[in-house]
């Protein structure tokens, strides 16, 4: 089966927006008009096709990105739905990674909201060409011109206005198309599927003429010949104008601005036309970059079917009917069912079922090509952010950075029946989300879950309850501290136990010292002349390593330890692997007591993007949190503050930041390194954990 659409007719897009800008409703309408979804779902009824997790339907917010394929004007459009909530920015970044272009939706009443600024800056980071869609123009208080001004002021973008609204609020009936120079009016009874082209209303002719002139002047800047011709008094024809607008959009010189009301079924078809006309195909973006298996030598893949196959797994989700699904963007080559691929882990993966997803219905396919976004069922080794590639030409596409989790909670199942279900649920959730980890506490036997933020863990506990029917008690959030030795020590430790019959005996002489930061547990065997038989040495290491992991002073792991096993003694009858393991444990405990312990805490790299007005407040607040300001910078018309702040001082920060900046600043934080806790804070930590 050959490719159904040539690559230049592909559009891989995402719709990004603030929580209530009508992103899901817009996607719904796109699916309805492109003939893929036959009943219009409404978010406020909780039936939207894209929001397919129960939780999303109830909260009316989109949490996971579902990928959907639809067709328009002989083009194939793959839509990736992105979440709009600040704690899911990792999901947004993940979807931006695999998009070629984006539509940013704005609420026509509220304009550019804080989360819109956040996703806009993330799209800048990944160099995603985009256009703006001002939605909800039927609502009381909607103001199109004010939104356009905010796009200039708050985002620092140059808007290229393609459409003007005819009427506003309850009298909003259609649009003036400035490129084609005509009006479009929708017919109510057809649910917006039918519309008519008409002449521009008399009372709008002057306004439309001025706006069209501005648009043409913006477009002809893209081409010297067009500019000269225009200055001689010749207007570009429609095809030339579209080509110039496309060129400027792909070059980030301006952003096309459209408008409508998705809920009232007006403006969606022009939006689809603009996606086709102005957003990039996979051929318009640079070749995907990566490295060879050595992790250093740069490599790349062109968007061609004949190139070696390469794809990026960007999302794993559990489907109630198919099981685990891995969503992958194919960058190059051709993928056939039944073939074996290399995963980054240098393991082979067999491609079993391959599906094209439409929100939550699915279609089995036999093969897929460069530019496709597909769901693969039954992959065993692949996790989010991994590359899948042809074994003959391995490549690692730049790996998405997933920070280590920094906040932990204990979770306890409420009943015996919940115990087993909880284990299954947590493992499934951890497979889907690389920034979520699960472990158990040796001493208390509690299950500890770790994640990126308070809301992150809250949502996961909630999913455990809904999807897996597990009821659990949840503890308060804790910082993951570490312990570190103060100085090197040398000691002899003897373990002796005699109780009739054979006893236990082991003796070791060890030197234990603080290692370099980040070196982990290092064990060096320097025993000469068989003073400890070879088969017992791994037991000494095991005992010492496990004791270090269990901690000494406050029960957090002792990290970066270097142990030299210098000498020892054994007994022919009483010595055994177990006896030497116990000896190792005792030696590590005693070494920690003699060396003394300092406490290390996670230090976060925090970036706050704030309007200029609040810069002083943001810096003052950072200093009060033991933060060290690394620098400030301007980005567009916002100020960026970078600081290193202990995680312990960042709990509840999101709410405080919102309150003193009226919700206009946003922050991102990721783990940077562990550092020593100041003495006064260390005393507080010990007292709290004692």
Swiss-Prot record:
SUPFAM superfamilies annotated for this entry?
Answer: EF-G C-terminal domain-like (SSF54980), P-loop containing nucleoside triphosphate hydrolases (SSF52540), Ribosomal protein S5 domain 2-like (SSF54211), Translation proteins (SSF50447)
InterPro entries linked: EF-G-like_DII, EFG_II, EFG_III, EFG_III/V, EFG_IV, EFG_V, EFG_V-like, G_TR_CS
Principal location class: cytoplasm
**Gene Ontology biological process terms, A to Z:** ribosome disassembly
An example GO CC term for this entry is: cytoplasm
Ranges of residues in domain tr-type G: 8-283
Q: Which GO terms describe its molecular function?
A: GTP binding; GTPase activity; translation elongation factor activity
| Residue ranges crossing the lipid bilayer per the database entry | none
Q: Which UniProt keywords apply?
A: Cytoplasm, Elongation factor, GTP-binding, Nucleotide-binding, Protein biosynthesis
Pfam families assigned to the protein according to its UniProt record, in alphabetical order = EF-G_D2 (PF22042), EFG_C (PF00679), EFG_III (PF14492), EFG_IV (PF03764), GTP_EFTU (PF00009)
> Which residues are involved in binding GTP?
17-24, 81-85, 135-138
The question of whether Protein biosynthesis is a record keyword is answered with: yes
Q: Which cell locations does it reside in?
A: Cytoplasm
Biological function: Catalyzes the GTP-dependent ribosomal translocation step during translation elongation. During this step, the ribosome changes from the pre-translocational (PRE) to the post-translocational (POST) state as the newly formed A-site-bound peptidyl-tRNA and P-site-bound deacylated tRNA move to the P and E sites, respectively. Catalyzes the coordinated movement of the two tRNA molecules, the mRNA and conformational changes in the ribosome.
Q: Which family does it belong to?
A: Belongs to the TRAFAC class translation factor GTPase superfamily. Classic translation factor GTPase family. EF-G/EF-2 subfamily.
Specify the protein name: Elongation factor G
Q: Which organism is it from?
A: Rhizorhabdus wittichii (strain DSM 6014 / CCUG 31198 / JCM 15750 / NBRC 105917 / EY 4224 / RW1)
């Amino acid at each position: 089966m050959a490719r159904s659409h040539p690559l230049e007719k592909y559009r891989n897009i995402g719709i990004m927006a603030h929580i209530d800008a009508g992103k899901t409703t817009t996607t719904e309408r796109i699916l309805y008009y492109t003939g893929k979804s036959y009943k219009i779902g409404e978010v406020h009824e909780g039936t939207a096709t894209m929001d397919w997790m129960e939780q999303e339907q109830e909260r009316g917010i989109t949490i996971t990105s579902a990928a959907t394929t639809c067709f328009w004007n002989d083009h194939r459009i793959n839509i990736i739905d992105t979440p709009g909530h600040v704690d899911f920015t990792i999901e947004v970044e993940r979807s931006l990674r695999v998009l070629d272009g984006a539509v940013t939706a704005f609420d026509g009443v509220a304009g550019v909201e804080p989360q819109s600024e956040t996703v806009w800056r993330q799209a800048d980071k990944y160099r995603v060409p985009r256009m703006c869609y001002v939605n909800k123009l039927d609502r009381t208080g909607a103001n199109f011109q004010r939104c356009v001004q905010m796009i200039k002021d708050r985002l620092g973008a140059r808007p290229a206005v393609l459409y003007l609204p005819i009427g506003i609020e309850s009298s909003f009936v259609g649009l003036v198309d400035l490129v084609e120079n005509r009006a479009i009016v929708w017919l109510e009874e057809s649910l917006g599927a039918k519309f008519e082209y008409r002449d521009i209303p008399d009372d709008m002719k002057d306004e439309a003429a001025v706006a069209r002139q501005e648009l043409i002047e913006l477009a002809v800047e893209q081409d010297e010949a067009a500019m000269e011709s225009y200055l001689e008094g010749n207007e570009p024809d429609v095809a030339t104008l579209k080509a110039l607008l496309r060129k400027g959009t792909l070059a980030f010189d301006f952003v096309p601005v459209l408008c409508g009301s998705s809920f009232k079924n007006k403006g969606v078809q022009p939006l689809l036309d603009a996606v086709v006309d102005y957003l990039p195909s996979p051929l318009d973006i640079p070749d995907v970059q990566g490295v060879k298996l050595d992790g250093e030598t740069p490599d790349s893949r062109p968007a061609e079917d004949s190139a070696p196959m390469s794809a990026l797994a960007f999302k794993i989700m559990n489907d109630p009917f198919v099981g685990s699904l891995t969503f992958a963007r194919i960058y190059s080559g051709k993928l056939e069912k039944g073939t074996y691929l290399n995963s980054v882990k240098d393991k082979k993966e067999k491609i079993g079922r391959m599906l094209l997803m439409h929100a939550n219905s699915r279609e089995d396919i036999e093969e897929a090509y460069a530019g496709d976004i597909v769901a693969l069922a039954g992959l065993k080794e692949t996790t989010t952010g991994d590359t899948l590639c042809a074994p003959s030409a391995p490549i690692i596409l730049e790996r998405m950075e997933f920070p280590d989790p920094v906040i932990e909670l204990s979770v306890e199942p409420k009943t015996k029946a919940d115990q087993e279900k909880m284990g299954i649920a947590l493992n499934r959730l951890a497979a889907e989300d690389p920034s979520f980890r699960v472990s158990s506490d040796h001493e208390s036997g509690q299950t500890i879950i770790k994640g990126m933020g308070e809301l992150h863990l809250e949502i996961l506990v909630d999913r455990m309850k809904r999807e897996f029917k597990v009821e659990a008690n949840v503890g308060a959030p804790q910082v993951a501290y570490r312990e570190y030795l103060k100085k090197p020590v040398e000691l002899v430790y003897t373990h002796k136990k005699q109780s009739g019959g054979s006893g236990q005996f082991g003796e070791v002489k060890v030197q234990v010292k603080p290692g370099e930061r980040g070196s982990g547990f290092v064990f060096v065997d320097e025993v000469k002349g068989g003073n400890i038989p070879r088969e017992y040495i791994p037991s000494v290491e095991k005992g010492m390593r496990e004791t270090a992991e269990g901690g000494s002073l406050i029960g957090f792991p002792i990290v970066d330890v270097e142990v030299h096993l210098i000498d020892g003694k054994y007994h022919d009858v009483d010595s055994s692997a177990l006896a030497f393991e116990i000896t190792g444990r005792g030696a590590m405990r005693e070494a920690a007591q003699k060396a003394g312990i300092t406490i290390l805490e996670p230090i976060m790299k925090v970036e706050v993007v704030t309007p200029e007005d609040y810069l002083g407040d943001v810096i003052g607040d950072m200093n009060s949190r033991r933060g060290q300001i690394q620098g400030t910078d301007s980005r567009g018309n916002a100020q960026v503050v970078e600081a290193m702040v202990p995680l312990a001082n960042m709990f509840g920060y999101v709410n405080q930041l919102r309150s003193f900046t009226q919700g206009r600043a946003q922050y991102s934080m990721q783990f940077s390194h562990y550092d020593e806790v100041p003495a006064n804070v260390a005393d507080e930590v010990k007292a709290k954990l004692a």
